[in-house]
Amino acid sequence: MKVAVTKAKSYEKKAVGTAVDEAINLLGGWQKFIQAGDKVLIKPNMLTNVTPDKAVTTHPEVIRSVIKAVKKMGAYPAVGDSPGISNIKATAKITGILSVCEEENIPFIYFKQSKTYNYMEGRFIKQFELVDCLNDFDKIISVAKMKTHVFMGVTGAVKNLFGCIVGTEKARFHLRMQNHSDFAHVMVDLYQLIKPTLNIIDGITAMEGQGPMSGDIVNPQILIASEDGFAADLVMADKMGFNAEAMPIVSAGIGQNRIIRLADIEIVGSGKDEQFEFAKPHTYKSMQDTYIPRFILKLGQNQLTAKPVIKKSCVGCGRCSEHCPPKAITIINKHAKIDYQKCIRCYCCQELCSYQAVILQDGIILKLLKCIGIYK
């Protein structure tokens, strides 16, 4: 299995187009993936309504390059997503994705309506409620963003498909799959159901630390591409300086015998030797069960994971309350308040807060384990 890693110093159109084409050519060329007449859905990471310079969403110039390449093949591209907030059109506009679609004269599809998709091969989920238009397309291209993620360690090609679940329906999965491992297995099933033709990860700018929303911007200046999303994510996590095979989604895929190992991947391209050391999410170590004895995990899961804490800078906008899966957040006197008896540590509040007013703090047992050296 090949994964291409190419370099682009900026989001200037020519630089991005060159990097995208180099990557796809190394994988066999656009003709291997897209044929004339194909209807192609391009799925960006359009997490929330922030501008492209924040490194939260897929940059519109990467989307433009993919659109142009698909059109050049005589195919018919469209772009679509369902962000974690209700106003899809505002998000599409602010992220710059809508403008690119208008400039390139292609449709932007607002993921609003769901339908049931059966997947009997699923290990955890055999039926998904996803956006109703997926079967209208011959090919799907996932164009993700290179970021850390406080719940999943990293987010890339596979996690990007969570956006095919419409709007607040995402909360149902967080309620059903409340720990890293179970949620990761659902992502494996979701990926296998949708099975994109091609996966591209925008890492020209990226996010480290408390991603996918509140981290710090870094500049790896790379793009990653593969026909296999797990392989792309493995290489991405490794390039970020993470224990790639221990990340929940990748680990779940390995456990299901669905993916190959990092050592079996052929990495090619101008950026193949690039290596970085991203700051880890506050939750990073708690994702790796080997650090903590199993009996302790069973005794106090919430005290072993970081909890979200609302800072004084909270403006009481209500976004976290509206989208909290277990409804653990209320707004009192223009300030969010968390009921920790209900909190499931999904970190959706931290992920969606535009004011970076949600931070993560270690649980009591986690602090103790750090003090005595069991957990470093």
Where are these regions (language model features)?
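N-terminal and secondary-structure boundary signal
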Residues: M1-V315, S321-H335, Y340, I344, ...
